[in-house]
Structure formats: structure tokens, C-alpha cells
């Protein structure tokens, strides 16, 4: 299974099953322990999503891509799976906020507190028009967090929303800016 997959945390043994899915590790490899102590319970109407980055990523064979985790970022993508027809659809809602948690050793909790809404044009679609399911992301600026395999990324979203993510790696080549 691809490393860059979303993870929905479930209590009990589901946490460990979810970690196995997301980490994509070989069975003999170590699995990082998910420690959510110090995080408050999600507010009513919110659902908790957790990403536990793996510290055992394969090195890139591309010499132009940095192999150092300090040069990596994780993009958080909030969205919803919707049915698409001939109309243009967009997801609307508040942006993500970050709250530092001193009781959790300075870790952060990311939240989208209000519900997401699908806005759409209202054209009459042809009955022959195919309908498909697709993921709509919240139309905001990309939200990046530093890559740290020691700490989980904890995000509380409105029920019905989904969290996806992808890993970004910097180039090794640093370019000089123009001085004016």
C-alpha cells in the first residue's frame, strides 16, 4: 500500500492495524508507538485523524532530491468524497488552525472546527452524463507541517470530512536569489 495514505484513528486494536497500513513497513520492521497522551478529546461534532510518519522511508535514487528529513514537509489535505455530475463543485469551509499543546510536550493539534459545505452550479445535466465519485479538497492554501517521525500529526475535522496527505521533499540544489 502506498506510504502517502490517509489514516483514520480507531480506538483499540484498530490503531495498530491503521499504523501497519500507513507505515507500509515489512512485517519484521519496528512500528513507532502512537502516543496521544496530552491531546484533548475531539470537540463534539469533530472526528480525530492521525498521521504517524515513518522514520524508515526508502532513500530516493534521484540525486537532486534531498534525503535529509529536515528538508521534508507533509502537506495536509482536508476534503470530502462527493458525487460529481456536469456541475462545477467546490468545497467551502474555514481554514485549518494550529493549537500548541504544552501538556503534550509542545506538540500541535490541527483543527477545522466548522462544517464543510459543497457549493455547486445548478445546471441541468443530461441523463446520459456520467456520474462519478471524486475527492474535493478544501480550496485553501496548502497546509505544510515539518516531517518528524517521532511525533504524530493529530487533526480534528468535522464529521464527514477526510484527511489525506502527501510527502514533499526539497531539491538538493540551492539557488541564489537576485539582489536588488
Curated annotation (Swiss-Prot):
Entry keyword annotation includes Signal: yes
Sorted UniProt keywords: Signal
Source taxon at top rank: Bacteria
GO MF, any single term: serine-type endopeptidase inhibitor activity
InterPro entries: Ecotin_sf, Prot_inh_ecotin
Keyword Signal: yes
Disulfide bonds: none
Signal peptide coordinates: 1-30
Family, per entry: Belongs to the protease inhibitor I11 (ecotin) family.
The name this protein goes by in its record: Putative ecotin-like protein
Pfam family, one: Ecotin
